[in-house]
């Protein structure tokens, strides 16, 4: 297991915008934009019918099914390699404005004092996404998607990563904590909320359908922003209406990423809100820090007063029962100062009630701890040691 490589929290707020890919950034499934045409003569429906049928028959993950189907159908027809998948990716059509969206939004965030990071969380193929023009231009901080393992000739031989609608959510937690490596178990480590690199309130999730619902719900429940998009050519809003009705999304807009579009205006408004909100969050955590310091100081003061009261009570104890009760309370205190230890040593030598029962189990344990905390050897500590050893 790899060691945790956690990205440190920035000195400016980070807004992570996470995208599904198919029908969110692109009008169609990526496999239907080159690959299926090569092996199925363009019969897209048949490919998905057979793939989904195989998943149902073998109780198989649908993403594993399509990955198997892609490799199986390519055999003897086309040479399927990592390079050819990236080449298919280069043919994928993108919605209007996507080409310059990522850098334009980054620059807008920069003007507002907010660091913008773009992430892909998709059930599509990582290799095809990496072949798109936007990915090659460095649009994405990280691409989380299904992918193959390849042999030394670049031929896919086994699934390396499978991303389905439920395990998509893990990547949101990775982004939140800055632990981006998919094999880094540090994502499970505890961090105080103020140390999260990208708290959920600063996560935007943009998707189009049911497969995005777990991520949308998680973002919504934790104060983030979920956006449903629909194709502006068909104007079919049935999916986003359903998601809105079920409280899965806060907003919906056409998948139009051009400057001045509804989506552009909405995301910029979220950036503006993030800039203002993070000022308030910063003030909140400053107040929290001061409150914690004050609370700790108060606890220390109360603890010190309690210890002094117990020392005074022990010094004046006139019965064995009272002495045992006081010692019982003192055993609950973890730390004693040097001055307090010295007072307790004097009491053991001067108060006959205490001195007489030094060999009793609870009193003996307590005074051994006091001698250890005191850490000095002199006539007084030597005498205490003798009394502890000899039982008077």
Where are these regions (language model features)?
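Alpha-helical substrate-recognition element adjacent to the catalytic core
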Residues: 2-152, 243
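Long, compositionally biased charged/polar accessory segments in the mid-to-C-terminal portions
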Residues: 53, 346-347
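Long, low-complexity, intrinsically disordered N-terminal extensions of eukaryotic proteins, enriched
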Residues: 1-9, 14, 46-49, 312-315, ...
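C-terminal accessory/interaction regions of large nucleic acid-associated machines
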Residues: 353, 363-367
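Low-complexity, intrinsically disordered regions enriched in charged/polar residues
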Residues: 30, 41, 54, 58-61, ...
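C-terminal cap/substrate-recognition subdomain and adjoining C-terminal extension
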Residues: 96-119, 123-339, 347, 355-356, ...
């Amino acid at each position: 297991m790899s060691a945790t490589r956690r990205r440190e929290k920035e000195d400016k707020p980070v807004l992570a915008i996470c995208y599904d890919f198919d029908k969110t950034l692109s009008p169609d499934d990526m496999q239907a934009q080159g690959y299926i045409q090569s092996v199925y003569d363009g019969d897209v429906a048949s490919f998905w019918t057979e793939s989904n049928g195989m998943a149902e028959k073998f109780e198989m993950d649908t993403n594993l099914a399509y990955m198997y189907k892609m490799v199986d159908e390519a055999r003897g027809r086309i040479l399927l390699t990592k390079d050819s998948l990236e080449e298919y990716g280069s043919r994928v059509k993108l919605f209007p404005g996507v080409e310059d969206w990522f850098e334009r939004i980054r620059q807008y965030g920069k003007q507002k004092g907010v660091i913008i990071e773009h992430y892909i969380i998709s059930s599509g193929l990582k290799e095809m996404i990496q072949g798109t023009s936007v990915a090659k231009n460095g649009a994405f901080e990280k691409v989380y998607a299904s992918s193959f393992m390849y042999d030394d000739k670049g031929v896919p031989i086994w699934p390396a990563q499978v991303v389905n609608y439920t395990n998509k959510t893990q990547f949101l937690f990775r982004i939140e904590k800055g632990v981006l490596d998919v094999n880094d178990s540090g994502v499970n480590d505890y961090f105080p909320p103020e140390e999260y690199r990208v708290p959920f309130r600063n996560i935007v999730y943009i998707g189009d359908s049911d497969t995005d619902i777990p991520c949308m719900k998680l973002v919504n429940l934790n104060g983030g922003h979920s956006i449903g998009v629909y194709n502006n050519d068909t104007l079919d809003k049935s999916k986003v209406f359903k998601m809105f009705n079920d409280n899965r999304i806060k907003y919906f807009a056409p998948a139009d990423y051009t400057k001045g579009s509804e989506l552009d205006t909405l995301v910029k408004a979220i950036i503006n809100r993030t800039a203002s909100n993070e000022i308030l969050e910063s003030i909140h955590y400053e107040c929290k820090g001061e409150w914690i310091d004050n609370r700790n100081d108060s606890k220390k003061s109360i603890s010190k007063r309690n210890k002094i009261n117990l020392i005074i009570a022990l010094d004046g104890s006139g019965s064995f029962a009272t002495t045992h009760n006081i010692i019982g309370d003192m055993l609950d205190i973890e730390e004693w100062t040097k001055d307090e230890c010295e007072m307790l040593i004097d009491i053991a030598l001067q108060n006959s009630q205490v001195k007489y029962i030094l060999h009793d189990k609870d009193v003996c344990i307590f005074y051994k701890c006091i001698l250890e905390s005191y850490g000095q050897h002199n006539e007084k500590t030597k005498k205490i040691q003798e009394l502890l050893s000899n039982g008077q």
